[in-house]
């Protein structure tokens, strides 16, 4: 996967994630998604700046993000994108080792979010379940 495609898909993921965050009726889901999209925005900015320092300017397109309704599927799709990019870069660790490490930090954040979504969202309930 070229860095241009990776950048475009990463921006699209953040847009979908932010939309899911705003649409959810579950407070724990709202918070978990907010943590991830804020982390991803800072992470992606830092990663792409470092890449441009390493390899020159990146020309990428802003792609239309396909809407999703399931936040777990959305995060898992992005983990797949991260794993593909990481796998290709890992073939030349001497050159891309720093990038592999950065991608792994984003994967870690995704896995933490998946843990929260799978274990806390359904257990805490939604607004209509509150005794108010």
Residue ranges and their predicted role:
Residues 6, 62-117:
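Acidic/histidine-rich alpha-helical segments that form the ligand environment
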Residues 12-35, 57, 90-97:
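Helix-loop segments that flank and shape redox-cofactor active sites
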Residues 1-14:
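Acidic, low-complexity proline/glycine-rich segments
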Residues 125-132:
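Short acidic DE-rich linear segments
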Residues 30-59:
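Conserved alpha-helical segments that form or flank metal/cofactor-binding pockets of metalloenzymes
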Residues 46-51, 112-121:
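Amphipathic alpha-helical coiled-coil segments
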């Amino acid at each position: 996967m070229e860095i241009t495609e990776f950048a475009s898909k990463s921006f699209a993921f953040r847009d979908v994630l932010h939309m899911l965050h705003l649409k959810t009726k579950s407070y724990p889901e709202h918070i978990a998604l907010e943590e991830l999209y804020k982390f991803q925005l800072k992470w992606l900015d830092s990663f792409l700046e470092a890449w441009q320092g390493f390899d020159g300017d990146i020309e990428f397109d802003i792609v239309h993000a396909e809407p999703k309704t399931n936040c777990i599927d959305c995060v898992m799709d992005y983990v797949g994108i991260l794993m593909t990019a990481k796998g290709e870069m890992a073939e030349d660790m001497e050159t891309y080792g720093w990038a592999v490490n950065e991608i792994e930090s984003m994967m870690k954040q995704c896995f933490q979010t998946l843990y929260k979504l799978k274990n806390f969202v359904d257990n805490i309930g939604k607004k209509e379940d509150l005794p108010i």
